[in-house]
Amino acid sequence: MSNLKKIEGGVTTPQGFTAGAVYTAIKKRENKKPDVAVLYSDLPCSCAACFTTNKFCAAPVILDREILKKGKARAVVINSGNANAATGKQGIEDARTVEREAEKLLGLGEDEVFVCSTGVIGQRLPVDKVLQGIREIIPAKLAKENGSEAAYAIMTTDTVRKECAYELQLSTGTVKIGAMAKGSGMIHPNMATMLVYVTTDAKADPADLQKMLSAAVDKSFNMCTVDGDTSTNDSIFLLANGASGVEIKTEEDKKAMADLVLAICTDMARRVASDGEGATHLIEVEAYG
């Protein structure tokens, strides 16, 4: 991949993406680090996602699986401090309330906003605080430069912010891809206790994106382990808004794009493993035969 270049940035580096984050005291912190974030695309996105294989998946995962069926979305709302897991029907209703409010504030239709939560399991989501957060963010705090704030907002036991970006020269132009992630404990295949958001300004079919993402996750996040636990909320999203005007159509470009998705997933998987709770070393094993 000689045309691949790592660049400064994160989830808002690709054209057309903005983000914002605020502190709402979902979990009280002395440093008042943000705990609610919104990631938004100016244009409709083709999307793909992979979710936890835990049979007791959290309410946001149940909701997001339904939204994903349309293959299109515009935004993601994320909160840390409360996982909205093991919360029954009420949890699903709460996630839906957050989704609908974000769609109203952004002027979107139904099922255009994914909702994600991470944090304490078994407690009801403090919906009022999440709603307060997204009302503060939309539209006042949505900005290109706030990608790093969003990356901070999704952290729980993480000790470092996790974000990166790449640029790829294709036959018809240049595309960018960015990512942010959280994860440091309960890390075990398949996937881990992680939330990962990958954005690109390439234009691509949802089915092609799903193939690329599933293959990349198998070779990256599904090979991570820290402590042997698989979580209830694991989710990774790939959003492509086409803002670059570069369409992924030829087999050559699809292969290059798939390699790009794998590169950024591998980068983020290493960052997650490196930040494992109590970890002092990162070990990679290559098996042959």
Where are these regions (language model features)?
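Short, surface-exposed loop/turn segments at secondary-structure boundaries that line and modulate
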Residues: 76, 80-89, 111-132, 225-247, ...
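A glycine- and small/hydrophobic-rich beta-loop-beta segment
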Residues: 241-289
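Carboxylate- and glycine-rich phosphate/diphosphate-binding segment that chelates Mg2+/Mn2+
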Residues: 202-260
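Short, well-ordered amphipathic alpha-helical segments that serve as non-catalytic structural scaffolds
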Residues: 56-67, 92-106, 210-223, 259-269
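Glycine-rich, mobile lid/loop segments that gate access to catalytic sites or pores
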Residues: 96, 101-221, 231
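N-terminal amphipathic/basic leader segments beginning at the initiator methionine
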Residues: 1-52
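Glycine-rich phosphate/pyrophosphate-binding loop regions near the starts of catalytic domains
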Residues: 38-97, 189-209
